[in-house]
Swiss-Prot record:
It is found in: Cytoplasm, Sarcoplasm. GO terms for biological process: removal of superoxide radicals. The gene is MB. Keywords: Cytoplasm, Heme, Iron, Metal-binding, Muscle protein, Oxidoreductase, Oxygen transport, Transport. This is Myoglobin. GO terms for cellular component: extracellular exosome; sarcoplasm. The lineage of its organism: Eukaryota, Metazoa, Chordata, Craniata, Vertebrata. GO terms for molecular function: heme binding; metal ion binding; nitrite reductase activity; oxygen binding; oxygen carrier activity; peroxidase activity. Heme b binds at H94.
Length: 154
């Protein structure tokens, strides 16, 4: 299920636009995730007190975590599927410490695509969206495989 060179080019081109404002994109993605799927907030002990959109919007901690999430995802995407070394420690913490189910990775993937489409509609057409979907699916599948190695069936 690898991506073609052209698909990776689509992914990395749009990711360059995301990187131009990691804080804004990351904050928006997490706010949208927690708003649209409130059960995901239960996995984040430090954010449980953020119950309103205004609280989420004002949270520097949430913004900072959004940068962390997108920075890590960007590193993985730039490896174009050759991400074993980068993915393993991420999968280990998500499986053994945070216990984040794979379905939550699906949820955030959908939100990432929605937010990029809203913020960069002119640059994120059908081909780019399909390529990003495929890249995020590759990431999720590889995370799920690693989860099993760590004994987490999430």
């Amino acid at each position: 299920m690898g991506l073609s060179d052209q698909e990776w080019q689509h992914v990395l081109t749009i990711w360059g636009k995301v990187e131009s404002d990691l804080a804004g994109h990351g904050h928006e993605i997490l706010m949208r995730l927690f708003h649209d799927l409130p059960e995901t907030l239960d996995r984040f002990e430090r954010f449980k007190g953020l119950t309103t959109p205004d609280q989420m919007k004002a949270s520097e901690e949430l913004k900072k975590h959004g940068v962390t999430v997108l920075t890590q995802l960007g590193k993985i995407l730039k490896l174009k599927g050759k991400h074993e070394a980068e993915l393993k420690p991420l999968a280990q913490t998500h499986a053994t410490k945070h216990k984040i189910p794979v379905k939550y990775l699906e949820f955030i993937s959908e939100v990432i695509i929605k937010v990029i489409a809203e913020k960069h509609s002119a640059d994120f057409g059908a081909d780019s969206q399909a390529a990003m979907k495929k890249a995020l699916e590759l990431f999720r599948n590889d995370m799920a495989s690693k989860y099993k190695e760590f004994g987490f069936q999430g």
